[in-house]
Design a protein with these regions (language model features):
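Short helix-loop boundary/capping segments at the starts of domains
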Residues: 13, 38, 62-66
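A short beta-strand-to-alpha-helix junction
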Residues: 22-25, 44, 69-76
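Short, surface-exposed acidic-centric catalytic microdomains
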Residues: 42-55
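Active-site-proximal N-terminal segment of extracellular/periplasmic enzymes that hydrolyze or transfer
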Residues: 1-37, 46
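PAPS-dependent sulfotransferase catalytic core
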Residues: 29, 41-42, 60
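Conserved S-adenosyl-L-methionine
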Residues: 37-44, 88-94
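Catalytic-site neighborhoods of secreted/periplasmic enzymes
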Residues: 55-153
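Residue-level signal for pocket-adjacent positions within structured domains
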Residues: 11, 34, 38, 51-52, ...
Length: 153
């Protein structure tokens, strides 16, 4: 059996054709819908990014009584248990918080991982001069404005 779990921090399900949205044109999600199981009755303990990931790894609620942070030495990780039992897992993530102080140690639980650079406030590319900010973009993080110059359309 193969299983793929897709997680998004900022994507609302009411905007997806898989959940009944008929005015968004999303051919990749429509194609994905044909090959996946859709869960309609799922509840989360934490909505913020890192607390939600810790709950996913450990199976324990932690938000409101534990701060944003790494796995602790006493934490059991689902993905580490899979690895110890010869079940391969892979993390592909643009969630740069995994590599920040306080957020580390999550990706080491997987069999392998790749970090997709350049999202949000990830300081992927360097530039001394401040980037030009087009008026229609509003206020964005400096690293994002620098990074987007290096991303292909």
């Amino acid at each position: 059996m193969k299983a793929i779990m897709v997680m998004y921090d900022s994507l609302n399900r009411h905007m997806l054709p898989n959940y009944g949205c008929d005015w968004i044109i999303a051919p990749n999600f429509a194609r994905l819908r044909e090959r996946v199981v859709t869960f309609d009755n799922h509840f989360v303990g934490s909505m913020p990014c890192m607390p939600a990931r810790r709950e996913m790894h450990t199976g324990r609620y932690n938000f409101l009584h534990r701060s944003w942070g790494p796995h602790e030495p006493f934490d059991d990780s689902t993905f580490l248990e899979l690895k110890h039992n010869n079940v391969y897992s892979h993390l592909a993530s643009d969630h740069y918080h995994y590599w920040e102080d306080g957020g580390a140690t999550y990706h080491h639980r997987y069999s392998s991982w790749v970090n997709v650079r350049g999202q949000e406030g990830d300081p992927w590319k360097g530039q001394v001069a401040n980037p030009e900010v087009p008026e229609h973009l509003g206020r964005l993080a400096r690293p994002f404005l620098v990074n987007r110059r290096y991303m292909q359309e």
